[in-house]
Structures are given as structure tokens and as C-alpha cells.
From Swiss-Prot:
This is O-methyltransferase CTB2. It comes from Cercospora beticola. GO terms for molecular function: O-methyltransferase activity. S-adenosyl-L-methionine binds at residue 289. PROSITE patterns: SAM_OMT_II. InterPro entries: COMT-like (IPR016461), O_MeTrfase_dom (IPR001077), SAM-dependent_MTases_sf (IPR029063), WH-like_DNA-bd_sf (IPR036388), WH_DNA-bd_sf (IPR036390). The active site is at residue 340.
């Protein structure tokens, strides 16, 4: 994970920008990859350790450029710029509601009037023109004198990548109003632990949790959009589930001796369990989720994995069912992106449900964001983590947590749990948090694997 740039004057920041740009250019040149261009997608560079120089250079460029802009603008103009950022989301709400992007050809141009005619619904040429011209000012679409508009490499993704488009829709149309409603939610309910009292419910005028709303008959569209959005933000990026599989956790050690049963708690359709089963066929896997979700997972599970991966309906707020295990076989309870959906009140309840039946040979692995202390990572990474924390607050009254916040939960349940280590995948933003019963010592070889772990209670890369 890239370090924070501490330069604080014009020439130092410019030097950082030039140095990082040279490193990125050299890396791409050596790999025979295209250089960054406004007219093409970003270079396709896999998220792995070998490509760390590229991602470090890219992060340094972004941070230096943003710091330069803040420095040159000065405090007053920086505040004024922030005050107008919501206007971009307002324009995108119009773009997504009326699907402007779908009415612009991927090759060639069209006119504002033709877009308005195709949309109908009382949308005027003037509204289309004003909205698209505003979007073009921050890099979405290209406008041509005479009333014409074309796609660029950025806006075309709204047509060619429906999962990414779903994430953008979710952010603009659902999360944006929910965020604006946070003060009203606090005024109405106080600082609440309940998902039914989050900004989302206030924004739609109902006391209802977002997931409950999505499961209502007329919430199906938003539910489907949410599922696509989760795929969109995870595909190949810092939140890709493969960081959990290949990101430094020593899954191979679980195959030793009598082996382990890996229980994927809230595992959705089982994509993580199936990826692990492909790589470690001697392990057994059980995917737990809502009845309708595990039905889909079981149906779509490849035939050759069905003897390794089973699907069981289970409410993760309740204690684990009895598991059939062989003599000496351990159980790993794996929970990815679960606790952040919930306030501490309910996150503690989820962990308590896992702790109740935990044996000395068992462990819990949480795949969650671990928010670093201030100044420990680059500003872009730090901001993205806090952005996600606010998303959890506005939508569900959930939260992203620091290491100390996780440890407070582990200490509050009965029996008490012990944080063994936190492994941070090289290019991922979700850590692997390993927990056992208090007093249990992991084998020495399990600590500090492949340079990813900094030992017990160490947040790696932070």
C-alpha cells in the first residue's frame, strides 16, 4: 500500500509528481503496455505483488496531483470547490434516471434534441444539454459545438459495463439522498444502532432497513441493481474476492493433519468458497446465507465442486448449528464483508454467535476493511476507506472499523476472543483478520507468511 506523501511546497510536490510519472511510464514501457490516455481504457495491469511498482506510482501521482491542486487553490477556494461537488451527483442522477448514456452511440455523435426525443417523459432538449454539458466539464461525455455530444472512454463504460453502471446508479440515486438525510436521521432518532433508523429510511420517508426495502416486491429493481453494483465494485479491483484467496493468508496450512471445514458465513452464492475449493480440494466448505440465496448458489455450483461445497440456510445472528467433523478436524468460520453492514450492537451479536460454539482448534477469519490510524497510508486510500464508512452509516447505520474497534468487540463476547493477526493483501483493501479463543497460540509457522504478516496483532502494510 502506497505511503503518504509529506511534501508541502510547490516544487517538492511537482518533483514527486514528475518522479512517480517517470516510474509509471517506465513500468508500462517495459511491459509493452499502453500509456494512460483519455481516449482509451486504463492499462490492464493485474493486481498482484509483481505489479506493486505500478500501483505505488499511480497512487503517488494521484496524491501529489491532489495535493498540488489544494496547495495552489488555497484554503478558501478548496472549501468553495468542495461546496460544489454535490452538483456532479445531481447531474448524474438525471443521467441515470433517463439513461442518457444509452441514447448516445458508442461510435459517432448525436444531438441533445435526439436524446430528448428518445427519452420522452417530458424531458426537454434544454435539460439534456445543461446536464450533459455539466457532466462533460468533469470528464463524462464529450461535447461538440453545434449541439452534438459523443461518448469518451469514461462515459462509454456506462453502456459497456452494466455492473459498474449499477454501482454509479446506486451511488447517485440511492446513497446520495441517504447521505443528505443523515442530519435529519440523527435529529429524528439520535445516533442510532438500528438499520431501520439510518439516513436511507429517512430519505424515502419510511422506517425500514435498506435490505428489507430491497426484498419488497416493488424493491426488486433496486435489489437487482445492488447485486450488480457489488459485482461492479469488486471486479478485478482492490475489493476483488480473489484477494481473500490469494492475498497472503496461508490456506494451505489448513489442509494439514485432519484438515478443516471452512464455513462461509453470509457467503452469498458461494463464489469465495468455490474459488478456495478449486485451489484446496482437500478442504471441505459450507456456505451459509438466506434460503433463497443458498438455493441459487447450490444450483450454480459446478458439478465437480459439489462434493466439496455444500449450501445451508442460516441466520448469522444466531449460534452456529452443530457441524459434523472428523476427529481432530478444525472449523474455520469465514465472514467476508459482513460486520461492516452492522452497528457495533449487531456486529457484536454476530461475533457472539460464532464464539459460542468455538473450540480451541477452531478460528474465525473476518475479511473486512481495517481503517488505519491517521497518516499511515496515502490520502487517497485513507479517504476511500472513510468514504466507505460514511456509505455504511448513511445506508445501514453500519461502520468500517479500526483494529482497536474490532478488538473491543472480541473482548466483549463470551468466551473472549483473541486477535491473532491481521493480514493485508498487497493490492487489496480488505484485510484478513484471524481470531481464536483467548489463550490459544497458533503454530509458529503460521505467523509471518510470505512477508505479508507483521506478526500477532499487526496490521500489515499499515
Amino acid at each position: 500500500m502506497a505511503n503518504r506523501i509529506e511534501a508541502d511546497n510547490l516544487f517538492e510536490l511537482t518533483a514527486e509528481l514528475v518522479s512517480a510519472s517517470a516510474k509509471l511510464h517506465k513500468f508500462l514501457d517495459q511491459k509493452n503496455l499502453p500509456q494512460p490516455s483519455f481516449d482509451a481504457p486504463a492499462p490492464s495491469v493485474a493486481l498482484n505483488t509483481a505489479n506493486k511498482p505500478y500501483y505505488d506510482a499511480r497512487s503517488a501521482i494521484v496524491e501529489a496531483a491532489e495535493q498540488l491542486i489544494r496547495l495552489v487553490r488555497g484554503p478558501r477556494d478548496t472549501l468553495l470547490a468542495l461546496s460544489f461537488e454535490h452538483c456532479a451527483t445531481a447531474s448524474m442522477q438525471v443521467v441515470f434516471k433517463y439513461k442518457f448514456a444509452n441514447h448516445i452511440p458508442l461510435h459517432g455523435s448525436t444531438t441533445y434534441s435526439k436524446i430528448a426525443e428518445a427519452v420522452g417523459d417530458g424531458v426537454t432538449t434544454a435539460l439534456v444539454e445543461r446536464t450533459i454539458q455539466h457532466c462533460a466539464s468533469f470528464g463524462l461525455f464529450e461535447t461538440i459545438p453545434g449541439g452534438y455530444v459523443t461518448h469518451n472512454a469514461t462515459s462509454s463504460l456506462l453502456v459497456t459495463d452494466p455492473d459498474l453502471e449499477a454501482w454509479m446508479y446506486l451511488s447517485a440515486v440511492i446513497a446520495y439522498p441517504a447521505g443528505a438525510a443523515i442530519p435529519k436521521a440523527v435529529e429524528q432518532y439520535g445516533v442510532s444502532s438500528e438499520a431501520t433508523e439510518a439516513g436511507y429510511g429517512v430519505s424515502i420517508g419510511r422506517k425500514i432497513a435498506q435490505f428489507q426495502r430491497f426484498r419488497e416486491p416493488d424493491g426488486k429493481k433496486d435489489h437487482e441493481m445492488f447485486a450488480r453494483a457489488m459485482r461492479g465494485i469488486a471486479a478485478g479491483g482492490a475489493y476483488d474476492f480473489r484477494h481473500a484467496v490469494d492475498g497472503g493468508y496461508p490456506w494451505h496450512l489448513l489442509t494439514e493433519g485432519a484438515g478443516h471445514l471452512v464455513v462461509d458465513v453470509g457467503g452469498g452464492p458461494g463464489h469465495v468458497a468455490m474459488a478456495l475449493a478449486e485451489k484446496y480440494p482437500s478442504l471441505r466448505f459450507q456456505v451459509q446465507d438466506l434460503p433463497e440465496t443458498v438455493q441459487v448458489g447450490a444450483k450454480n455450483c459446478p458439478e465437480h465442486l459439489r462434493k466439496h461445497v455444500t449450501f445451508v440456510a442460516h441466520d448469522f445472528m444466531t449460534p452456529q448449528p452443530a457441524h459434523e467433523v472428523q476427529d481432530g478436524e478444525g472449523i474455520v468460520y469465514f465472514a467476508r464483508f459482513i460486520l461492516h453492514d452492522w452497528s457495533d450492537k449487531y456486529a457484536t451479536k454476530i461475533v457472539q454467535a460464532l464464539a459460542t460454539g468455538l473450540r480451541p482448534q477452531d478460528r474465525i477469519i473476518l475479511n473486512e476493511v481495517v481503517v488505519p490510524e491517521a497518516g499511515q497510508v496515502g490520502r487517497e486510500t485513507e479517504r476511500r476507506m472513510h468514504d466507505r464508512d460514511l456509505l455504511m452509516l448513511m445506508n445501514l447505520n453500519g461502520r468500517e472499523r479500526t483494529q482497536s474497534a474490532f478488538e473491543a468487540i472480541f473482548a466483549s463476547v463470551t468466551p473472549k476472543l483473541r486477535l491473532q493477526r491481521v493480514i493485508h493483501p498487497e493490492q487489496g483493501e480488505l484485510s484478513l483478520i484471524e481470531v481464536t479463543l483467548d489463550g490459544v497460540e497458533l503454530p509458529a509457522q503460521a505467523n509471518g507468511v510470505n512477508g505479508h504478516a507483521n506478526g500477532t496483532n499487526g496490521v500489515n502494510g499499515h
